[in-house]
């Protein structure tokens, strides 16, 4: 197999993506589908799922609130019924969490962020590992954030979960290596899209500056002076599912244009 051939994802992969009906998750799903994978997405939003089914006929799309352990378990029953197994789990579902000082964040906001961004990733991994052990190309991919390598003032719950995801990934890579399961994390930087627009808007309102000025402040944090796209993240995700990445595990890979600070 040539080096170029090794860059192509393994054919026919069975891929499950949490939070896969919109945003980065949808772009990841589209990329895997284009590469010939069998894709199952779950998402909390029924309108997003309906739009996904219309856009990608023949795919499996399941409604699930990832804060509910029983609903996550149900996703894996669907996975087994439709695909008979799993090769790649993309642990993608997450929320932005509150924006504000630590003294202004409520316990409920903190717990909600931890539950969706961290506990759900553990629960998905818990159910996925038996299936991944039966796969010849088992890969567990956690979507974290550049906030998982930098401090992030005013976004403490979010940053705390992303650091924890990296720790989860590192531990699972050591634990599952002998089963030939690779475990990695992608750390997207400041990603263009509605979610980031909301973060910028909230921060601008909080400090009392125009939204355009706050947007430029965010761009100034990036060495390349541009935000990344969901397609940038998807391209790296596909690489990690290729023979070229067969010895890549335990890595927290930044796709961020070199964010210098947050």
What are these model-derived regions, one by one?
Residues 85, 177, 182, 248-250:
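Short, small/polar-rich loop/turn modules that mediate ligand/substrate recognition or access, typified
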Residues 130, 174-178, 246:
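Alpha-helical segment proximal to the catalytic Tyr-Lys
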Residues 100-102, 106-114, 218:
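Substrate-binding pocket helix/loop in short-chain dehydrogenase/reductase
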Residues 2-7, 96-99, 150, 226, ...:
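Short C-terminal tail/terminal secondary-structure segment
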Residues 7-40:
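Canonical Rossmann dinucleotide-binding motif of NAD(H)/NADP(H)-dependent dehydrogenases/reductases
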Residues 145:
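Residue(s) in the substrate-gating loop at a strand-loop-helix junction
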């Amino acid at each position: 197999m040539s080096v170029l051939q090794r860059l192509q994802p393994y054919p026919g992969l069975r891929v499950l993506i949490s939070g896969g009906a919109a945003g980065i998750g949808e772009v990841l799903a589209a990329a895997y589908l284009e590469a010939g994978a069998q894709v199952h997405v779950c998402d909390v939003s029924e309108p997003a799922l309906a739009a996904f089914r219309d856009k990608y006929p023949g795919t499996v799309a399941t409604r699930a609130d990832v804060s509910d352990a029983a609903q996550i378990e149900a996703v894996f029953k669907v996975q087994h019924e439709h695909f008979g197994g799993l090769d790649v789990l993309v642990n993608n579902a997450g929320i932005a969490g509150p924006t504000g000082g630590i003294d202004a964040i409520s316990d409920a906001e903190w717990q909600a962020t931890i539950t969706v961004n961290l506990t759900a990733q553990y629960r998905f991994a818990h159910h996925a590992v038996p299936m991944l052990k039966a796969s010849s190309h088992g890969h567990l991919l956690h979507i974290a954030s550049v906030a998982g390598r930098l401090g992030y003032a005013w976004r403490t719950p979010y940053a705390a979960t992303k650091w924890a995801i990296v720790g989860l990934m590192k531990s699972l890579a050591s634990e599952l290596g002998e089963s030939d399961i690779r475990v990695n994390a992608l750390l997207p930087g400041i990603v263009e899209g509605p979610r980031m627009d909301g973060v910028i808007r909230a921060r601008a309102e909080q400090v009392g500056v125009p939204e355009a000025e706050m947007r430029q402040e965010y761009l100034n944090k990036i060495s390349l002076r541009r935000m990344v796209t969901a397609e940038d993240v998807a391209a790296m995700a596909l690489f990690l599912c290729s023979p070229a990445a067969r010895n890549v595990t335990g890595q927290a890979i930044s796709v961020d244009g070199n964010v210098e600070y947050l």
